[in-house]
């Protein structure tokens, strides 16, 4: 990795730094159990209007609350969607944006490492992949993603025999699913 890439990476926000920009009550955290390539965090938030800096990882949000209006902009007009239980939002890495919502929300965040998504993309496309783009989406129309995110959450809360292998399988499923989108 060259100097420009190292400087860019040093300016990106890691999952543990998110509360500096989006203050909320932490309800779940995979960091103490040492998950690799993916971090799961749960939060309860009041209604907020926040600037989200450039993230190091891809960020997926699953809503576990009653309906709220979620709005996003990145240098342009606001885009608003109704979100609620079972709905997901997608945020790419390396781009800042502004988000706001009109009422308290309960969410699960999954942060997926760029290196992991690129690794899986290399296997899928059978060639070297240095970057994968993902378009921000306030309301992802996706029947699979909420279930995958729920499986990660269940694994964190309950665990069990073969936990590392199971989690690795979930990471692979998540990466392939995102690449198909």
Regions flagged by a language model, labelled:
Residues 20, 26-130, 159-160, 164:
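N-terminal regulatory/effector-sensing and dimerization cores
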Residues 127-173, 177-181:
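Amphipathic alpha-helical segments enriched in hydrophobic/aromatic residues interleaved with Lys/Arg
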Residues 17, 116, 144-147:
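Exposed alpha-helical structural elements
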Residues 2-4, 28, 174:
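Hydrophobic alpha-helical transmembrane segments
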Residues 2-22:
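OB/S1-fold single-stranded nucleic-acid-binding modules
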